[in-house]
Amino acid sequence: MAVPKRKPSVSRRKIRNVFIRAEMKKNLSNYSICKHCNYVKKKHHICNNCGYYKESLIYKIV
C-alpha cells in the first residue's frame, strides 16, 4: 500500500479541498424542488413523484 513520504502542508490541503467542495456544489445545483409536490427532482426533467413538467401533466402516476 502506498504511503506518503511527507505530511501535506495546510495550504495544499486547503487547495485540494476547495476543488472537491466546488465539485460537490456543482452537483447539488443540478436539482430543484417540484412546484406541485415539493419533491426533489433534477432540473429540466419530469418529476418522478407527480409526473408534472413545467405546469403540465406529462404522465399520470397510479
Curated annotation (Swiss-Prot):
Which segment of the chain is annotated as a signal peptide? Answer: none
Q: What keywords is this UniProt entry annotated with?
A: Mitochondrion, Ribonucleoprotein, Ribosomal protein
GO molecular function list: structural constituent of ribosome
Q: Name one GO biological process term.
A: translation
Q: Which superkingdom?
A: Eukaryota
Name where it's found. Answer: Mitochondrion
Q: Name one GO cellular component term.
A: mitochondrion
Query: A Pfam family name for this chain?
Result: Ribosomal_L32p
Q: Which HAMAP family match?
A: Ribosomal_bL32 (MF_00340)
What family is this? Belongs to the bacterial ribosomal protein bL32 family.
**UniProt-recorded name of the protein:** Large ribosomal subunit protein bL32m
Q: Which organism is it from?
A: Reclinomonas americana
Query: Gene of origin?
Result: RPL32
